[in-house]
A protein has these predicted regions:
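Short, conserved catalytic/metal-binding motifs centered on acidic residues
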Residues: 1-9, 53, 60, 78, ...
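Active-site-proximal, Lys/Arg-enriched surface segment
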Residues: 1-54, 58, 368-379
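A short acidic (Asp/Glu
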Residues: 12-14, 106-113, 130-136
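A short alpha/beta connector and helix-capping loop motif
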Residues: 16-25, 107-125
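Active-site beta-loop-alpha junctions of metal-dependent nucleic acid enzymes
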Residues: 66-91
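An anionic, glycine-rich sequence signature occurring as long contiguous blocks
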Residues: 116-252
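A short, flexible helix-boundary coil/loop motif
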Residues: 141-199, 263-280, 284-380
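A C-terminal functional module that forms or caps the active site or interfaces directly
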Residues: 229-235, 240-282
Length: 380
């Protein structure tokens, strides 16, 4: 599972529910200049609201949504929207893991999610002590591996993927290598129910032990020193690619959810320039995205059934409906009605049905089935 936030931008002229100014946030942002990705950042003010989305990356389905002002911190509704997603899939599925971005690096929040039995994949910030320790240990493990030795508590793994470029005689094949180092039981002092506080300096304080995956090389491109990606996880698996693949799914929410919602579903094209219009439109867009996924799954199952020779479509549904209800009768009395099997109606009418009586069906059994006491039935 993936959880992320995205802005639903508006303008200062929008009408809010309580008459207050449109929510806004001011910060530095790099202009969208593709020819110069290192353009100088400028101060901008963005108006609108923020959406919290829980996304299932394999089926590409939104599971929960929350909306609040754009200046609200990402952590504000992070747990609530995840809890809502768990309720929405209760009885059908279970959320086993969640991938988050650096905006959710909060010890209290992560500890609360972990208590629910959900595995967490989240990258550490470059200046964090836990990230610096993980990089240092990973480099030593890699150097020891080059000498044919191993470093205790570390696992070095590589994955090679062939990528074909071009076609025909000019086609070339490139091998992309991803190198990971898994570091087990790395101390993290801020990952607890209280977050970062003075208890960390206590002699009796025991930091949270996490597994970390350090990405030394990603698809053939080596990471710069001191800037290697460090993925923190509560997954006890020894293979570092478990955490790598789990976090890699987070990129799907940017393209298959946020971008598609804005570009293909016109998320920011609000039908009314008001807060209510923004909220209604957001829920409607993500509801439609979920319905489309459900329809595609239904069509896929129907196509496979048709290839096996099974009948599909409305004709089959009507036949099944007729088969399941051919021996039922509906009885009306004033403003009440009841649906009975034919033999039940006959028994209630004082008739005998030998075929069902041999199976143990009697008037008393029918009355008990519908919660009518036998004495009350005799008196009536």
């Amino acid at each position: 599972m993936v959880r992320d936030c995205t802005d639903d931008e508006a303008t200062p002229s929008y009408k809010t529910d309580d008459g207050r100014p449109v929510p806004h946030v001011t910060g530095e942002k790099r202009p969208d200049v593709r020819a110069n990705r290192h353009a100088k950042k400028v101060e901008v003010t963005v108006y609108g609201w923020k959406l919290w989305v829980v996304w299932e990356p394999q089926m590409k389905m939104p599971l929960a949504l929350a909306i609040d002002d754009i200046q609200v911190h990402d952590n504000q509704h992070a747990y609530e929207v995840l809890a809502q997603a768990q309720q929405n899939v209760a009885g059908i599925a279970r959320i086993r893991s969640v991938a988050l971005d650096r905006g959710f690096l909060d010890g209290k929040l992560l500890s609360r999610i972990e208590k629910d039995g959900i595995l967490i994949y989240i990258p550490a910030k470059a200046n964090m002590r836990v990230a610096q320790d993980a990089r240092e240990i990973a480099r030593r493990a890699w150097e020891e591996g080059q000498r044919g030795r191993s470093l205790e508590g570390c696992v070095v793994r590589e994955r090679h993927e062939k990528v074909r470029h071009g076609s025909g005689k000019k086609a070339t094949t490139e091998i992309l290598t991803t190198t990971l180092v898994g570091v087990r039981e790395l101390g993290c002092d801020w990952w607890n129910e209280d977050g970062s506080n003075s208890k960390e300096n206590s002699k009796s304080y025991e930091p949270k032990l996490l597994n970390a995956t350090v990405v030394l090389r990603w698809d053939g491109a080596p990471k710069e020193a001191e800037h290697e990606v460090v993925i923190l996880t509560t997954n006890p698996a020894q293979d570092p690619f478990e955490a790598f693949d789990g976090y890699d799914d987070r990129s799907l929410i940017e393209n298959t959810c946020n971008r598609e919602a804005k570009e293909q579903w016109f998320l920011e094209h609000h039908p009314k320039r008001s807060e209510a219009g923004v909220r209604v439109h957001a829920y409607f867009v993500f509801m439609c995205m979920a319905l489309v996924v459900g329809f595609r799954v239904h069509r896929s199952n129907s196509d496979r059934a048709r290839l096996r020779g099974q009948e599909t479509g409305i004709a089959r549904y009507r036949r099944e409906l007729r088969t399941n209800n051919w021996d039922k009768v509906m009885v009306f009395t004033e403003e009440h009605f009841g649906i009975f099997r034919n033999y039940e109606f006959a028994l209630l009418g004082g008739l005998s049905v030998l075929r069902n009586e041999r199976k143990g069906e009697s008037l008393a059994v029918v009355l008990e089935r519908y919660g009518v006491p036998a004495q009350r039935a005799d008196s009536s």
